Amino acid sequence: MQILKDRIRKDGKIKGGNVLKVDSFLNHQMDIKLFGEIGKEFKRRFADAEVNKILTIEASGIGIACIVAQYFDVPVVFAKKNQTKNIAGEVHTTKVESFTHGRVYDIIVAKEFLGKGIFRKRR
């Protein structure tokens, strides 16, 4: 997506450990117009897919996920980085490495919010 590449080249900064810092437009301060363009691009690329949810991880991914979900008219589900008292019942868990935080998280999503066949093409 050229608009995102251009924005990264313009405002992104490379930090130690090859970390790309994009906090001025993606994950601390959010450029909603840019998010809208990203949402349009996801809709274009997955127009033939039967999308029923947008899944992301808590924190940085939520903003973009919400805009993308508007284009598909579907809910957003986000994986939590910590078990909380209000997540009851069966859950999906996996480990995810955060390069920016330098640690591994055990992320959690309640099974009730995910269904079978997360991705399949429309016929």
Predicted features along the sequence, with ranges:
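Short, glycine/charge-rich flexible loops or terminal/linker lids adjacent to PRPP-binding catalytic cores
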Residues: V74-K121
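A glycine-rich, hydrophobic loop/mini-helix early in the fold
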Residues: F42, L55, F72, F78
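Short glycine-rich phosphate-binding loop at a beta-alpha junction
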Residues: V51-E58
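Short Gly/Thr/Asp-enriched flexible loops that form oxyanion-binding sites at enzyme active sites
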Residues: G63-F72
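Structural motif
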Residues: L55, K121-R122
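Active-site-facing substrate-recognition patch
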Residues: M1-V51
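Short, flexible loop segments at the rims of nucleotide/cofactor-binding pockets, characterized by
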Residues: M30-L34, L55, E97-G102
